[in-house]
Amino acid sequence: MLLGCAQLLGERTLLITQDELQGKLATMFPLQRKVLEVFNFTVDTPTVTLLPESGRVATHLGVTIQDRLQGREYRGAMEISFALRFDAKGMALRLKDVSVDSIHIDGISAKTQRALSQLGPMIAHDKLEGQMIYGFKPEDLARADGLGYTVGAIDVTPQGLSIRLIAKP
C-alpha cells in the first residue's frame, strides 16, 4: 500500500544547502593524514563552492605539510573538486571522481612543487575517493523509505545539493 503512495505522490526532493554542507564539513576537520610515512598532511576546514554547470562541488583547502625527515613545515592551499554518490548501506553521501585542480605550497622549490602536483591526484584518489562528506541519521530517511521512496540522482544546483527521492522499483 505504501509503495503505491510513492507512485501516486511522484518524485520528491531533499535539499542540502551550501551552508548546511559547509557546516557538516566543519565538524570533520581538521583532517590529518600520513603520506608515504614521511609527510604529515593537515587539511583545514574547506570552503565549499557549488559547480552546478558541471554537477560537481569544489573546495578550497588550507594545507600544512610536515616533512618528518627534514623537520620542516610548509603551508599552502589545494583546490579539489568532486562528484557525489549515495551509499545506501552507510546512509551517506560520498566523494567520487575526486580531482586535484590546483596545489600550491609556499617555501618549496619549483621542482618539488611539480612533483607534488604530479603526486596530488594519486594522493587525493587514495585518501579522498569514497570519503563520507555528509551522513544521514536513520530517521532522516526512514520516513521516505516507509512511504516507498529511495534515493535517486544527486544534482548540484545553485541552491545546494538536490537529492531526488524516487519510488522504489
Feature map (PLM): residue ranges:
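Extracellular/lumenal and peripheral-membrane lipid-interaction modules
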Residues: 5-169
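Sec-dependent bacterial lipoprotein signal peptides
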Residues: 1-3
